[in-house]
């Protein structure tokens, strides 16, 4: 039986020498791989009490939406700044070469709601940390952070210390 990592394309020396790029598009392009990825992520949510699934732009949408559908939960978009039409709150965070800003609608999370945050990959943890801070600012509680792939060598879990973090596939390097 194939595992999710069997569907992940690994590209050496991209975007720079010494890096192995883990390409999730190869998972999405295979019906069996996509189904397996969603099923494995859903298994990591067994026993998790949540009210809302939220996904980080853009691949968090790809994996978060089917999970919300399976669990019969609403789905909330965490978007790059300037993409949401209604009143938002925003959070800036550090990137390797600069900063980025994400935002969420002010009415997307109600006080006391239990939220699962979803993204395709955890690297440094900056995006998901900022997303968690937005949820908490609105009065929500982050009960799980869920990723298809984790690049353990980039130590994103340290940034997310105190949160329940789950990953389907863990690669030890960067």
Predicted regions mapped to residue ranges:
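Short, glycine/charge-rich flexible loops or terminal/linker lids adjacent to PRPP-binding catalytic cores
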Residues: 74-116
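Conserved G/P- and acidic residue-centered "switch" motifs that form tight phosphate/ATP-binding loops
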Residues: 120, 125
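Active-site-facing substrate-recognition patch
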Residues: 1-50, 100
């Amino acid at each position: 039986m194939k595992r999710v990592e069997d569907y992940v394309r690994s590209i050496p020396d991209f975007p720079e020498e010494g890096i192995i790029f883990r390409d999730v598009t190869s998972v999405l392009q295979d019906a069996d791989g996509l189904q397996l990825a969603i099923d494995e992520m859903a298994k990591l949510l067994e026993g998790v009490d949540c009210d809302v699934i939220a996904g980080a732009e853009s691949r968090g949408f790809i994996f978060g939406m089917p999970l919300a559908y399976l669990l019969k939960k609403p789905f909330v978009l965490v978007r790059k700044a300037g993409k949401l039409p209604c009143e938002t709150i925003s959070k800036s965070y550090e990137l390797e070469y600069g900063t980025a800003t994400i935002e969420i609608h002010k009415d997307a999370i109600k006080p006391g709601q239990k939220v699962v945050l979803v993204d395709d990959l955890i690297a440094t943890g900056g995006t998901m940390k900022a997303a968690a801070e937005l949820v908490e600012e609105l009065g929500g509680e982050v009960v799980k952070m869920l990723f298809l792939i984790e690049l353990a060598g980039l130590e994103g879990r340290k940034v997310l210390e105190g949160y329940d973090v789950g990953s389907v596939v863990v690669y030890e390097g960067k």
